[in-house]
Amino acid sequence: MHIAIAGNIGAGKTTLTKMLAKRYGWKPHFEPVDNNPYLEDYYADMTRWSFNLQIYFLNKRFRDVVEISKSKDTIIQDRTIFEDARIFAPNLYDMGLMSERDFNNYTDLFDLMLSLVKLPDLMIYIRCSIPRLIDHIQQRGRDYEQTMRIDYLRGLNERYERWIKTYKGHLMIVDGDTTDFQDNPQDFKRVTDMIDDRLFGLFPME
């Protein structure tokens, strides 16, 4: 089974992935951040490095999806291949940070990859406001994120909302503004109750 966590930068995807992996005994797949050779350069000069970064993520995410499809374990994934192609790359293009040539090349490659993979069994989307995202980003203190532009973050959030309205797979939405799953056990239980209902309830997903 493939469970995926989606959400903007700072939404709490990695935290929730770790907590759910521990709670259910699922195998976690985390977003490759610490060893990413492009990330610091990208935040310093987005126009120069946007295509390189997005191809790096697309490659890693596609590899993850292929591995997940072959696994007999239940995998919970921190961020998905769909977010790269439907959120981040188009946002960079619209902001003038990725050329039309690079964007078209990227999109063609993603469409080919998408024809070879299936949707996750359950997509969990963490919805957060901009102030909440900024608070989380400041708390975790990654140097390369501190120079992030607010309009960049806002553009991503708007794209997430448009994308999630058109998503065709099994979907569960967590309100990240009102649900403190990290520090409030009752809030975390509410999240797991929702998951239990969808995966193991009387009328589970088909």
State what each model feature region is.
Residues 13:
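Conserved lysine of the Walker
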Residues 87-159:
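A glycine- and Lys/Arg-enriched "phosphate-lid" helix/loop adjacent to the NTP-binding pocket
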